[in-house]
Amino acid sequence: MAHQAHAYHMVDPSPWPITGATAALLVTSGLAAWFHFNSMILILMGLTLLLLTMYQWWRDIIRESTFQGHHTLPVQKSLRYGMILFITSEVFFFLGFFWAFYHSSLAPTPELGGLWPPTGITPLDPFEVPLLNTAVLLASGITVTWAHHSLMEGQRKEAIQSLFITVLLGLYFTALQATEYYESPFTIADGAYGSTFFVATGFHGLHVIIGSTFLIVCLVRQTQYHFTSNHHFGFEAAAWYWHFVDVVWLFLYVSIYWWGS
């Protein structure tokens, strides 16, 4: 029987990276097929494979960390660095969208009528649904911090309640955003304004859905006694991600909804 003389987790061979990559290929190809041919077969296949991969990969990580004890202090430190680098990469991802927006809006071309918003575009009122969305996300940032402090202080019941409220607020934000899209007077095909608006806010909406999923998994794990007051990196990573989503929304609201209108 082999014994390891170090504190690092030597991961077993896993099929989930390749199934996850295949799911990503199917989803992106499916999006193109949906836009151009109105066919949703590929995207549904991709989403199904993605959900199955997420479930089984999360199951394996929970088994390795919670039940087998592979997530030692050095491993947790490495995971923290990994999460920080991931969020940094996401910052630059959104930086590209803001660059596209400001490039188009600060010096509108003659094709846009020389003004911003372009001629023929009726922008959304920033003090209606977008302002409510801002309040909802800021409230969710408060409740996720409440959950984190409750967890660190061993207040299990309070942590579950506050995390549940955070998930509800995240789902409410998504519902409000979907309603706003449905009732929007312009589309993604309406030139530079439509494309920058829907791509930037749409990718943020996708991040809210991902963050909500992350928090739902943490909520289920919390009810199953997977977290302790000093060992809960899974929740910590979800909270960092949620705060990042909050901050991006504030920049989106000020730039695209308020200044851009």
From Swiss-Prot:
Keywords: Membrane, Mitochondrion, Mitochondrion inner membrane, Translocase, Transmembrane, Transmembrane helix. This is Cytochrome c oxidase subunit 3. It comes from Latimeria chalumnae (Coelacanth). It is an enzyme of class 7 (translocase). Its EC number is 7.1.1.9. One of its GO terms (molecular function) is cytochrome-c oxidase activity. It is found in: Mitochondrion inner membrane. Residues 1-15, 67-72, 153-155, 224-232 are mitochondrial matrix. Pfam families: COX3. The chain crosses the membrane at residues 16-34, 41-66, 73-105, 129-152, 156-183, 191-223, 233-256. It is a multi-pass membrane protein. The gene is MT-CO3. Component of the cytochrome c oxidase, the last enzyme in the mitochondrial electron transport chain which drives oxidative phosphorylation. The respiratory chain contains 3 multisubunit complexes succinate dehydrogenase (complex II, CII), ubiquinol-cytochrome c oxidoreductase (cytochrome b-c1 complex, complex III, CIII) and cytochrome c oxidase (complex IV, CIV), that cooperate to transfer electrons derived from NADH and succinate to molecular oxygen, creating an electrochemical gradient over the inner membrane that drives transmembrane transport and the ATP synthase.
